[in-house]
Amino acid sequence: MSGGYDLNLFASPPDCKFLCSVCHGVLKRPTRLPCSHIFCKKCIFRWLARQNTCPCCRKEVTRRKMVEVNKLRKTIGRLQVKCKNAAAGCLDTHPLAHRKEHQDSCPFELMACPNEGCTVQVLRGVLDEHRQHCQQNGQQRCPLGCGSTLAALEGEHHNCYRELRDAWVQRHERNRTLLLGLLGRVRRVHLTTSIIHQQLAQLSNFLEDDDNLLLNAQVQETEVTPEAEMRGTQGQSVL
């Protein structure tokens, strides 16, 4: 990868004194060696990683004596460059030093739609128009972090405090409804348990009464049997 600026970036061909002898691009962060030859900082460090001599004169290089040439860097920064979006229609030219500033505002810069769920990329100049048509499908999170999902144009009227308060009220009511439902179930279970206890008590009483009746019947039967036997014996004696 080249360490310098691509020649095609510039509005007019740069002077050869601004070119790097290693990458043949325009010098980026120009760095001068002790022998006075100047290269892109990245280019010369890559070169010196393989051999410790100047690419031009082959003199040995002492790294601690290498210096960045800030004056030359500023001169190169004033060279006029074309917008990187020239192919998309931008005809603007500006100093190299202002390249990023222009790029951040260029109407021909390709931008991703910020609406959540939308994957369309449009030019910055028509992004607002796209968002107006995209708002029914595209949504975005509240930038203040309340967690609300907003339609594209709702942000101006969005109130985080109100949204959070309403969400809290809804959650509180939902929890209250759940609690009342659980309490109702507990009451029904308690009532059912009480009825079962009553029925078990009644059944126990019935069983106890049956046991008493059975016991009394057995006692009476025991008392009657000896008397009958005695009467039978006496009758046989008389005969």
Curated annotation (Swiss-Prot):
Compartment annotation: Cytoplasm; Nucleus
Print the keywords alphabetically: Cytoplasm, Differentiation, Metal-binding, Nucleus, Spermatogenesis, Zinc, Zinc-finger
Where does each TRAF-type zinc finger lie? 101-156
Phenotype on disruption: Male mutants fecundity is normal.
Q: Report the GO molecular function annotations.
A: zinc ion binding
Q: Name one GO biological process term.
A: spermatogenesis
Tell me a GO cellular component. Answer: nucleus
Tell me which stretches of the chain form a coiled coil. none
Q: Is the DNA-binding keyword given for this protein?
A: no
Question: Which tissues express it?
Answer: Expressed in testis. Expressed in round spermatids of the stages VII-VIII semniniferous tubules. Expressed in elongating spermatids of stages VIII-IX seminiferous tubules (at protein level).
**Chief location of this protein?**
cytoplasm
> Positions of the zinc fingers (RING-type)?
20-58
4Fe-4S: is it a keyword of this entry? Answer: no
Write down the PANTHER family for this protein, in alphabetical order: RECEPTOR-ASSOCIATED FACTOR, PUTATIVE-RELATED, TNF RECEPTOR ASSOCIATED FACTOR
User: Whom does it interact with, and what assembly results?
Assistant: Interacts with DTNBP1.
Its job:
May be involved in acrosome formation of spermatids.
Give the protein's recorded name.
RING finger protein 151
